[in-house]
Structures are given as structure tokens and as C-alpha cells.
Amino acid sequence: MNMFRQAVRSFVRYQSTTSLNPKILPFNAKETPIPKCVEAVYHAPLKIEPTHRDLIADIQLRSYDNENLDFFSSFVLRAGYYLGIPMKGPKPLPTKRKRWTVIRAPFVMAKSKENFERHTHARLIRLYDCNTELVETLLSYISKHGISGVGIKCNLYQREPIDLDSKKDGPELENIDISSQLQGLDDVVGAKVVELLNNPEFKKHLQ
């Protein structure tokens, strides 16, 4: 392909104020073919389409620099693809803006103010149709190879049946030793507690 006749190696800008100067290294593509893993870097990350759309987790990435954020989002999508995790995203979340107003200096410059502003960019990646072990493997991998200035937050979703039998899990009232629980109480208070626990109207609410 003509687009791969020359290898363009772009260096990631870890500071948004630095200039980006890509280096072009000419070579003969027939003599030095580009491996498939390197060629895939020039394309968008591959994704596995979810079949059941069962949401397992979502990963939120936050950073003050959107360039590092987009770079790390692409890294997370590529790692999830090779682990076989169906993923959606990255979805841009609203940018949070925070401003401060402080004095320039004490004494002479006390009446002069200076404003500072901070932008927090965020991306959302959703994980579908996988188990928690794969999610933990992905989180440990991206945490180990994370870049500075990008925060990771993960929300896991677990589903439980709603028809649980509470009688099997909870202790029965007949097996509770009330006397051992009331040793440190007053006799009058203990008698009132025993009377309340033996009340049939009160037992209805505990079943």
C-alpha cells in the first residue's frame, strides 16, 4: 500500500504545550515489510460487537490533557479487543471546568486579581458480555501500563435474583438465646425487651 511506503513515527506529546514534530524515516517497503501488529497502530482500534448487550462494567478515564486521554483510550480498546471483550466507546463525557480567583501578590498588588481555570476531560468505555475475571485482567493490565496524568475509575455491575428465601438466610427466633443478650441490661429494661420479643404482633414484622 502506498500509505505505508514511508514509516511515520509520531511521538506522543505528554504536555499539550510542546510542539509535535514527527520524524519521517524512508525505507524500502519490499525489503523491510511492516509487521501486522505495527500496521494496526495506524488504523482505528478493532472492536467486538456485543451479542447479548449485558453490561458488565464501565471504565471512566479522566485527564487534564485530552491528547493523553485519547491516546490511552485507544490503548484500552486495543487491550480489550485482544482479550475478547466486547466494548463500546470511547464516549466523550462533559468537560468539567473549575475556576479560581486569587490576588496577584500581597501588600502592593493585593487589589489586583488573577484568574486560573482547569479543564477535566473524561471518556467512557462500556464492557459487555464477559465475566469479572476478564475485567480484573484488563484493569490490572491497563493499571500496570498506564501513563501519568490519566485517572482510571471502574464501576462493576452484578446481578442477583430477587426471589431469595429470607427464611433460610436469617436466624429463627426460637433459636435465639435472649438471656445471654440481656445480661448487661437492667431487670426492668430486660423484662420489657422479653415482653416485646414475645409479642405475636412484633413477630409478624420479623418474619
From Swiss-Prot:
Transmembrane segments: none annotated. Residues 1-14 form a transit peptide. Belongs to the universal ribosomal protein uS10 family. InterPro entries: Ribosomal_uS10, Ribosomal_uS10_dom, Ribosomal_uS10_dom_sf. PANTHER family: 30S RIBOSOMAL PROTEIN S10 FAMILY MEMBER. GO terms for cellular component: mitochondrion; ribonucleoprotein complex; ribosome. Keywords: Mitochondrion, Ribonucleoprotein, Ribosomal protein, Transit peptide. GO terms for biological process: translation. Gene3D superfamilies: Ribosomal protein S10 domain. Part of the mitochondrial small ribosomal subunit. The keyword Chaperone does not apply. Its main location: mitochondrion. It comes from Kluyveromyces lactis (strain ATCC 8585 / CBS 2359 / DSM 70799 / NBRC 1267 / NRRL Y-1140 / WM37) (Yeast). This is Small ribosomal subunit protein uS10m. It is found in: Mitochondrion. The keyword Transit peptide applies. Involved in mitochondrial genome encoded proteins translation. Involved in the binding of tRNA to the ribosomes. NCBIfam families: rpsJ_bact. It holds the Pfam family Ribosomal_S10. GO terms for molecular function: structural constituent of ribosome. It comes from the Eukaryota.
